[in-house]
Amino acid sequence: MAGLILRKEEFFPSATQAVAVADRYPQNVFAEHTHEFCELVLVWRGNGLHVLNDRPWRITRGDLFYIRAEDKHSYASVNDLVLQNIIYCPERLQLNFDWAGAIPGLFGTPWKPHWRMGSTGMAQARQVISQLEHECARRDAQGNAMAELLFAQLALTLQRHRYATDDPAATQREALLDKLLAALAASLSRPFVLERFCEQEGGSERALRQQFRQQTGMTINHYLRQLRICHAQYLLQHTERLIGDIAMQCGFEDSNYFSVVFSREIGMSPGQWRQRSRAAA
């Protein structure tokens, strides 16, 4: 059975249009698919499971993905997940601009799909996307040209403000919530103490907990546990490490407790997941 392929004609009104904006307010569960076009995915709020080329990512506010046409991905376990897809056809781009320099993986350049954006960059990107959406709706030559200019501006804005998911140093000028998300991503294998984090950053623990839940739809502990489970899934599928070693690498000192948590979240034991994921690959 052939996989689901999203076709250009379903999303681009004309054969000359290079860029379009696909809103997902909210993003529902979506089966695995590929595309005849590329896309940028920026998450505004809520949470969900994004599986990209068989690798699971627990996504929430500020997550940014660069998706190539051949990449297969899906969305599951969504909870008020709000995101925008900026879709584009590389072969239709006319503007003399270094697209490959700004967009990882384009035209065979090194591909790193997953990044994060802080509040400052997200606010700037939102303004550009709003203008881009307006121009795409015009459906004329001037609108197409303006849309391409704005897409170049967006690509540069994302390039300027994106940072590695586990790089807390990159968030020093960002809001406290952005710093927290980066600190959590850098704590997959070691304990994270919110009280200590708030002391270091001079923030209110109670206020930060409330803000985190409001923006992501999860508690801080739940989000960190989901990050660790996703990382464990990846290691189980792609390495030969013992389950006990993987448990330690994912922040679980007790392998039995790891197995209990993993089974509760995934619906099968770590060993069963390893066997099933490899059989499906």
UniProtKB/Swiss-Prot annotation:
Activates expression of the rhaSR operon in response to L-rhamnose. It is found in: Cytoplasm. It comes from Klebsiella pneumoniae subsp. pneumoniae (strain ATCC 700721 / MGH 78578). The record marks D245 as: Interaction with sigma-70. HAMAP family: HTH_type_RhaR (MF_01533). CDD domains: cupin_RhaR_RhaS-like_N. Residues 178-276 form the HTH araC/xylS-type domain. The keyword Transcription applies. PANTHER family: ARAC-FAMILY TRANSCRIPTIONAL REGULATOR, HTH-TYPE TRANSCRIPTIONAL ACTIVATOR RHAR. This is HTH-type transcriptional activator RhaR. Residues 195-216, 243-266 bind DNA. GO terms for cellular component: cytoplasm. One of its GO terms (biological process) is rhamnose metabolic process. Binds DNA as a dimer. The lineage of its organism: Bacteria, Pseudomonadati, Pseudomonadota, Gammaproteobacteria, Enterobacterales.
